[in-house]
Amino acid sequence: MWFKNLTLYRFNKPFTTDTETLENALADFTFSPCSSQDISKFGFSNALGKKGQALVHSAENRHLLCVTKEEKILPGQVIKEALDEKVAEIEELENRKVTKKEKDTIKDEITTTLLPRAFSRRSQTHALIMPELEMILVDSSSATKAEELLALLRKALGSLPVIPLSYATPIESTLTQWLQAGEAPAPFEMQDEAELKSDSDEGGIVRFKQQVLQEDEVLAHIATGKQVHKLALHFGQSIAFLMQSDASIKRLKFSEEFRAGNDEVGTEDPLARLDADFALMGSELVAFVNAVNQAFGPLEQSV
């Protein structure tokens, strides 16, 4: 439930789809497990997991959704060994070289044979549609996984006019200014971790962890032309995170004190607790993202 990463996208047009319409659109693209011959399957699943009953969970016009992906695990080395063995057998029996086209066909046959016996793994990715921010927040550290989710959502809705979040001023410039100044603007507070990178290929990368970032050793790297591309920060007393120069947010962690705000709800009704946690997280993410946009903005104008 609690998001751990943020890959952010903003709408080019207001998102006006209501919960019922969104639910119906996703219903045509629900997840189903791999059959014996499927390499992978991908689709929408219950937003609140096994406790939930809907593909979309909405509160205060914020929409939570989830995609599930199942992939068969076929190690490349296993396929290669089987292919090499089969090719060697044919070449010995028929006294000729096997062509590339034949190898491709044999490889497909081997894959088809092995698929029913292959193990599979499942992963889930959540996204939060937030019309009040005109944004979609994807809980993933991988841009590829985020784009997969958006592609399926676009297919379900027919269109999805979103672009990756970016700012007019490079984030690394802003982070570097903060480190040089020795502080981040409220409500943010710098922590003890940063990554500095040179614009030139020869300049290299320097990482600092559990270190006072205002020390001369750190500032000396900035003096030689390096810029801050990752910086650990706190947002008030509620969120710790790692801000990255590509506008993605990693290692998002809500504090125990903040999460305890729903302790009075209890855990006797798991669905009620999930709903309360979703409302609490959603409200804080609105404040958080607004503060991030204000600190790093203005937004880069879309073409």
Swiss-Prot record:
Keyword Cytoplasm: yes
GO biological process: DNA recombination; regulation of DNA recombination
Localization annotation: Cytoplasm, Nucleoid
GO cellular component: bacterial nucleoid; cytoplasm
Keyword Oxidoreductase in annotation: no
A matching Pfam family: RdgC
UniProt record similarity statement: Belongs to the RdgC family.
Stated name of the protein: Recombination-associated protein RdgC
Source species of the chain: Shewanella frigidimarina (strain NCIMB 400)
